[in-house]
Swiss-Prot record:
Gene coding for it: hisF
InterPro entries: Aldolase_TIM, His_biosynth, HisF, IGPS_HisA/HisF, RibuloseP-bd_barrel
EC number(s) recorded for this UniProt protein: 4.3.2.10
SUPFAM superfamilies per UniProt: Ribulose-phoshate binding barrel
Subcellular location, principal: cytoplasm
Superkingdom, natural source: Bacteria
The entry's keywords: Amino-acid biosynthesis, Cytoplasm, Histidine biosynthesis, Lyase
Cited Pfam families: His_biosynth (PF00977)
Active site: D11, D130
The protein's name in its UniProt record: Imidazole glycerol phosphate synthase subunit HisF
């Protein structure tokens, strides 16, 4: 069995790490380069760096911040935000990203996923799915930083991105995001059961127990969290120890 991964997330706006509730109400947390370096030392398995307003403001991800972050981080770094062309992917991989996260551009042009996978390999292509509940056991895909309802069924889209060559799905429950009430287990379970590629659970983590819970009750491969780590509520190692006690395999 593959070890489960713990992934701190750096949501970056104007070159600073921020954290908000339900995608709004953003608070400044600090410098992305310093924070990424701390998580690298703390035993994180990977880091996700999301330039959260890049797509909405129609500007490119801050490549220099990516370069500086990548120079301090020796674990896989996934970068997302404003990526809409193969050239964008190339630029970020060259800047030091190991993977790129596609969202709005992939929904607009699903063949972009295939194009990215063919050029750089599926292992480089993560598709981020921001999903919001519309009725019982039904979720829609949202784009543009969670501002626009596409009307696309999230389960159907997850299957499609896997078929198009994505190597991984970063699944965020917009209903849970920032609430610290725990991951959306129902959404996460349904999506991870419907695809054969790895799924990263995101949105709602408020404690180490929530991470234990998402691995115990769904087949996700990784858990992403921000505020519990940013605010020092628990460390990556504390989470991993809890997972070990629960019989869940992690890299210590």
């Amino acid at each position: 069995m593959l070890a489960k991964r713990i992934i701190p997330c750096l949501d970056v706006k104007a070159g600073r790490v921020v954290k908000g509730v339900n995608f709004i109400g953003l608070q400044d947390i600090g410098d992305p380069v310093e924070i990424a370096a701390l998580y690298n030392q703390a035993g994180a398995d990977e880091i996700v760096f999301l330039d959260i307003t890049a797509t909405y403001e129609e500007r490119k991800t801050i490549v220099d911040v990516v370069e500086k972050t990548a120079s301090k981080v020796f674990i896989p770094l996934t970068v997302g935000g404003g990526i809409s062309t193969v050239k964008d992917i190339y630029t970020l991989l060259r800047a030091g990203a190991d993977k790129v996260s596609l969202n709005s551009a992939a929904v607009k042009n699903p063949l972009f996923i295939q194009e990215g996978a063919e050029h750089f390999g599926s292992q480089c292509i993560v598709v981020a799915i921001d999903a919001r509940k519309v009725e019982e056991d039904k979720w829609h895909v949202y784009v543009n930083g969670g501002r626009t309802d596409t009307g696309i069924d999230a389960v159907h889209w997850a299957k499609q991105v896997a078929e198009l060559g994505a190597g991984e799905i970063l699944l965020t429950s917009m209903d849970a995001d920032g609430t610290k009430d725990g991951y959306n287990l129902r959404l996460t379970d349904i999506i991870s059961a419907n695809v054969s590629i790895p799924v990263i659970a995101s949105g709602g983590c408020g404690s180490a127990n929530h991470i234990v819970e998402v691995f115990a009750h769904t087949s996700v491969n990784a858990a992403l969290a921000a505020s519990i780590f940013h605010y020092g509520e628990c460390t990556v190692q504390e989470v991993k120890q809890k997972l070990q006690y629960a019989g869940i395999e992690v890299r210590i």
